[in-house]
Amino acid sequence: MQIETLTVEPLTKEAFAPFGDVIEVEGAQLRLINNGTTERYHDLARVEAAGTQTRVLINIFRGQSFAAPIDIMMMERHPFGSQAFIPLNGRPFLVVVAEDAGAGPARPRAFLARGDQGVNYLRNIWHHPLLALEQKSDFLVVDRAGREDNLEEYFFSDYAYRIETTQTA
């Protein structure tokens, strides 16, 4: 099996734009609400929920922690809805995404999300399942429910991608 190394990039809105949204207050539109006692950071992600008998779900995922090296052997995508991950414990996590190459994902990219950043994967974006770092971590997950199967998985057969370090280049 051939193994290619992925370099971890810092998570920025610009770099992540082809895959979805970075959820953070930095640069967000601020509105004061509740008689000025609450700051609302408005419209941070594009939530998508298509299909039949569709609704938006709010879940908590508890992710086991990973340490480098991490081998990326598979990816998944959701054809009918976006999926957002917002860390609840303030810990960093890895985000691995790829554009579609027709018969599966293209070469993945890896991003390091800070503990105050979340991500929203748009519909049909290939991504690796949750990669919490440091210790077991909880994430608020905004997801889609509906009649259609909203999960496609792809397993790399002849190669894998390896993250040698969780630090950014």
Swiss-Prot record:
It is an enzyme of class 4 (lyase). SUPFAM superfamilies: RmlC-like cupins (SSF51182). Its cofactor is Ni(2+). Pfam families: Ureidogly_lyase. Keywords: Lyase, Purine metabolism. Pathway: Nitrogen metabolism; (S)-allantoin degradation. InterPro entries: RmlC_Cupin_sf, UAH_cupin, Ureidogly_lyase, Ureidogly_lyase_bac, Ureidoglycolate_lyase_dom_sf. One of its GO terms (biological process) is allantoin catabolic process. It catalyses: (S)-ureidoglycolate = urea + glyoxylate. Homodimer. This is Ureidoglycolate lyase. The lineage of its organism: Bacteria, Pseudomonadati, Pseudomonadota, Alphaproteobacteria, Hyphomicrobiales. The gene is allA.
